[in-house]
């Protein structure tokens, strides 16, 4: 029964990450899986589940604060191209994304579809 709860939790984490950020689902899934595994191990060893929950919540708060403190705004076309290029693993794709974002503006929508053709 605990494994099913853990699997549902990991699935929910991946979906929420995709909905909110659109990226990072693999990282979120690995982190959630580790939290569930270690949490169950600690509870089985006698740890207080509510104490674990409070500890996880405090850790999340501190990590979030740290990330927000070091986060940088991505504003220029060049910054967008560099960031998108890193994310895509291909600078040409990053440049195309930056160009598309430049054309549609901050409120615009860009739709990306898979293609069976090779190259761009």
Curated annotation (Swiss-Prot):
What keywords tag this UniProt record?
A: ATP-binding, Chaperone, Cytoplasm, Isomerase, Nucleotide-binding, Stress response
Q: Sorted alphabetically, which Pfam families does this protein's record hold?
A: Cpn60_TCP1 (PF00118)
Record GO biological process = protein refolding
Record localization:
Cytoplasm
- Give binding positions for ATP: 23-27
> What main location does UniProt list?
cytoplasm
Quote the SUPFAM superfamilies the UniProt record gives. GroEL equatorial domain-like (SSF48592)
Q: What is its EC number?
A: 5.6.1.7
Q: Which reaction does it catalyse?
A: ATP + H2O + a folded polypeptide = ADP + phosphate + an unfolded polypeptide
Q: Which molecular-function annotations from GO does this UniProt entry contain?
A: ATP binding; ATP-dependent protein folding chaperone; isomerase activity
Leading EC class: isomerase
> What subunit structure does UniProt give?
Forms a cylinder of 14 subunits composed of two heptameric rings stacked back-to-back. Interacts with the co-chaperonin GroES.
* Role: Together with its co-chaperonin GroES, plays an essential role in assisting protein folding. The GroEL-GroES system forms a nano-cage that allows encapsulation of the non-native substrate proteins and provides a physical environment optimized to promote and accelerate protein folding.
Similarity comment: Belongs to the chaperonin (HSP60) family.
Q: What is this protein called?
A: Chaperonin GroEL
Organism encoding this protein = Mycolicibacter nonchromogenicus (Mycobacterium nonchromogenicum)
User: What taxonomic classification does the UniProt entry list for its organism?
Assistant: Bacteria, Bacillati, Actinomycetota, Actinomycetes, Mycobacteriales
């Amino acid at each position: 029964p605990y494994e099913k709860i853990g699997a549902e939790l990991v699935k929910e984490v991946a979906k929420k990450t995709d909905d909110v950020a659109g990226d990072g689902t693999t990282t979120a899934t690995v982190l959630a899986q580790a939290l569930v595994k270690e949490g169950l191990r600690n509870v089985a060893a006698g740890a207080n589940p509510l104490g674990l929950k409070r500890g996880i919540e405090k850790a999340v708060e501190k990590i979030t604060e740290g990330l927000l403190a070091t986060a940088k705004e991505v504003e220029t076309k060049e910054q967008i191209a560099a960031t998108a290029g890193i994310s895509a693993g291909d600078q040409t794709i990053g440049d195309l994304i930056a160009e598309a974002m430049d054309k549609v503006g901050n409120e615009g929508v860009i739709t990306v579809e898979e293609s069976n053709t090779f190259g761009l």
